[in-house]
């Protein structure tokens, strides 16, 4: 398995890294791609949560020069779509220090923005693909660890608005996230990711993590439904009690309480 790359451009280096503690999903295809080697962080470690990735990257950044460029790509959902020859040129054209991929808004625009917020405009930043200079990445990633919220995507968007050196890859020439609804869609981006690929574990995790953002909205709808459709009172009360029990006992509430 190839784990190291250091492509030199003048006085700086560009390094492509991922974080994975095991082989899963598209990992083998990623690390054995024909275009560029990948540096793997976190291999063999115990997975504790999404902040593991950020902590792992930050630790690695301490070994790099401030002017180096690090590209982070998700280890289980991403492929290197083509040669990386134009990577530096495309990044410099963005005129920013940190570039983050655009989220595909899997839950629809309104719901996705309700949960994640936005990054410097109307776009949602996706935490699975990003790149930047080491100096600015350190500032940004450290800030994403400050909130008590455990969701890296929420924190990425919250922190994004604090720094004017960050942009979202609106043109999607470097990064492209493709939703499960558009799997046959072609992309000319260098790095292509397929976040939220269908699996039972992902759906379960999403239900646990994201109920906190929509619980009040759903509860209000259920109350309205009870008033509007009294003949379904037994069913609606059961659903309300079940949802409330799940929220109280199992749902993550770190981002809303």
Question: Which residues does each PLM region occupy?
Answer:
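Short beta-alpha junction loops
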Residues: 22, 44-45, 77, 103-107
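A generic structural motif
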Residues: 38-47, 100-104, 151-156, 168-175
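Structural alpha-beta junctions
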Residues: 32-40, 93-98, 161-168
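N-terminal anchoring/stem segment of glycosyltransferases
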Residues: 4-69, 216-256
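Conserved donor-nucleotide/metal-binding helix-loop-beta segment in metal-dependent transferases, i.e.
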Residues: 79-117
């Amino acid at each position: 398995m190839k784990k190291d790359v250091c492509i030199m451009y003048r006085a700086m280096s560009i390094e492509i890294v991922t974080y994975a503690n095991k082989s899963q999903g598209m990992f083998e295809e990623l690390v054995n791609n024909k275009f560029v080697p990948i540096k793997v962080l976190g291999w063999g470690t115990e997975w504790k949560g999404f902040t593991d990735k950020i902590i792992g990257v930050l630790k690695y950044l301490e070994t790099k020069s401030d002017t180096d460029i690090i590209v982070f790509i998700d280890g289980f959902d991403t492929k290197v779509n083509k040669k990386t020859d134009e990577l530096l040129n495309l990044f410099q054209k963005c005129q920013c220090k940190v570039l983050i991929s655009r989220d595909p808004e899997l839950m629809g625009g309104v719901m996705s923005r309700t949960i994640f917020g936005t990054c410097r405009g109307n776009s949602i930043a996706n935490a699975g693909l990003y790149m930047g200079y080491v100096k600015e990445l350190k500032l940004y990633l450290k800030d994403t660890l400050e909130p008590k919220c455990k969701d890296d995507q929420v924190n990425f968007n919250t922190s994004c608005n604090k720094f004017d050196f960050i942009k979202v890859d609106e043109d999607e020439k470097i990064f492209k996230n493709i939703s499960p609804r558009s799997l046959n869609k072609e992309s000319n981006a260098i790095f292509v990711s397929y976040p939220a690929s269908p699996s039972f574990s992902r759906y379960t995790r999403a239900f646990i993590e994201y109920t906190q953002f929509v619980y009040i909205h759903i509860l209000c709808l259920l109350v309205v439904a009870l008033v509007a459709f009294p003949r379904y009172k037994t069913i609606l009360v059961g659903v309300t009690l079940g949802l409330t029990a799940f929220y109280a006992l199992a749902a993550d509430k770190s981002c809303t309480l």
